């Protein structure tokens, strides 16, 4: 059986009395693109630095391709790290930057030159070998940093928010390029970000971190469609939270009283009538009621339109739901045409759309 590219077992890290990592375990398979996603201070960068060898864990072990590297220095590990800002050597040309680690490994000049050209082609910077870092744009600098990190063929590439300093359009372009490079090489990437879009676009799996712990791991689709907590649902995409109490169950479905309105959702095992509950609804799951189409019982709400915002790909409307709670719906432009502030709007959704959660998960 192939060993994981990265195996993290029971990692804990303290800085004085502060617990930065709380017994974290995670496996990354060879060729996987895994993102560590979470808010500032959740421990994701600390975890990456421990994998890289720049921090030592208080407890736990790190293995790379079956080798325990916990006690090895950073330069002895088969990893490379790309920082938030490229950290290029300003006195070296692009080619010299890319070939730096290869010279330390005593590669021949001919071999280094060939590898530099190969890396420049990979990141689409052909012809820029002799440029200096001060002559590069932000996106070009990050491409050079990526080429430098990949040149020595690390077993695992670690990336610490490498796109966060770029403007939006360039960041979106680089997300696709980075993912394409990873797929082409079949390399193992561990990527730290606080940007949910980056994680969704690029990752094979996402590990959501909160308070020094990994609270959910899964594919982008799994985490978006089946979040295991209110925190995860809110961190990945916009969501509507409707709080209420279960008042009935009929096999696979539960009825929840939300401010006097009975709504229906797939039953969550372990929940029973009388339990406090939270109903999650994604804005894109909501549609205007079609008078000619039968709706699913318990999957409709009416409210007064309080706002609408044009987002380009959709129009996000806000209605006052049960108890005045704002409810967001993302409608097609033609759907929202003719709606005005103050209108009574009826929204419906598919019976499979709601996600039921226990109130104590909040």
Sequence positions of predicted segments:
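The feature captures the beta-strand-to-loop junction immediately N-terminal to the Walker
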Residues: 37-39
